[in-house]
Amino acid sequence: MTKLFIPYIMGNKDLIENATLLSENGADIIEIGVPFSDPVADGPVIMEAGQQAIKQGITIDYIFNQLEKHGDQIKCNYVLMTYYNIICHYGEQAFFEKCRDTGVYGLIIPDLPYELSQRLKQQFSHYGVKIISLVAMTTDDKRIKDIVSHAEGFIYTVTMNATTGQNGAFHPELKRKIESIKAIANVPVVAGFGIRTPQHVADIKEVADGIVIGSEIVKRFKSNTREEIIKYLQSIQQTLNN
């Protein structure tokens, strides 16, 4: 089975250009961050990118507008990574409608309690927008079974107990945990948080069905040339499916 490559970008003025480049260079699903003033799950790189986007005047309406106009340029699925506060403020039903209308494949909502995610799935499943489940290494086995039994799209395993993109030190129990999740899952199980290099990818792909890379991609879009970014993406893609 081909491993999934899921890069993350911040929703900013370059959203469509960056997403298009990723979709042309091996991305299977793109995670688009919605800037938020209090991003509790984000590491310093993504937090700074979010602050910059807010200064640029980027809002969820801007992101929806761009996806509505130019989403067909993105040649793969895309999901929104957003905090529940944004959905609540927008209005749950209006938000899910807009996601459907702008081609959003799914939502990653890091501060969403499991019980609330179940309500949203039941209430808004007819819009066809998947709510992606997150599993931390600290999640107990009973809760994992509950989460996995209702998972849709893919399962996002958080490979560190720290915030995103720090030192890349994977939890010693990580592989065992991912394997146990895969044994009971009906959707791909991907690993994210702290994955930056082809070496990290080679290590984690032994057990995971795919990887999410966030901070490193955001950093490279900020400071690298287009050619350097493409070269990096190719190195990840090569390692992932070698």
From Swiss-Prot:
- Note whether Lyase occurs among the keywords: yes
Alphabetized, the UniProt keywords read: Amino-acid biosynthesis, Aromatic amino acid biosynthesis, Lyase, Tryptophan biosynthesis
Q: Is Amino-acid biosynthesis among this UniProt entry's keywords?
A: yes
**Which Enzyme Commission numbers does its entry carry?**
4.2.1.20
Family, as annotated? Belongs to the TrpA family.
Concerning PANTHER family, the annotation shows:
TRYPTOPHAN SYNTHASE ALPHA CHAIN, CHLOROPLASTIC, TRYPTOPHAN SYNTHASE, ALPHA CHAIN
Q: What is this protein called?
A: Tryptophan synthase alpha chain
Q: What is the lineage of its organism?
A: Bacteria, Bacillati, Bacillota, Bacilli, Bacillales
